[in-house]
Amino acid sequence: MAKMFDLRTKIMIGIGSSLLVAAMVLLSVVFCLYFKVAKALKAAKDPDAVAVKNHNPDKVCWATNSQAKATTMESCPSLQCCEGCRMHASSDSLPPCCCDINEGL
């Protein structure tokens, strides 16, 4: 019975297939990051922020679209607020401020 592939051919097929798998994984990671950044930029263009009247103009209360229509002065303290546009790196749980679309990217 004759050998179908010698050792060099098997090694070359293994290297080629591993490079193909690595390229596909890298491509999927790039697409995933692209869609995340596109979603973040789209959300930054249409911020769901409602400024509170009679308060500090630097404070912005964040709400969803349905809450933004019915937000009153009494319901605002339950929403998350941020002071100004400069936030520390330790405050990941707060929403991004709406100063610049590309800020934080």
Curated annotation (Swiss-Prot):
* UniProt entry keywords in alphabetical sequence: Secreted, Signal
Give the originating organism.
Answer: Homo sapiens
Q: What is its main location?
A: secreted
Secreted among keywords? yes
Cell location: Secreted
Record lineage = Eukaryota, Metazoa, Chordata, Craniata, Vertebrata
Tell me its family. Belongs to the FAM24 family.
Signal sequence segment: 1-32
Its Gene Ontology cellular component terms are: extracellular region
Designated name of the protein: Protein FAM24A
* Protein's gene: FAM24A
> What single Pfam family name could you report for this chain, choosing any that match?
FAM24
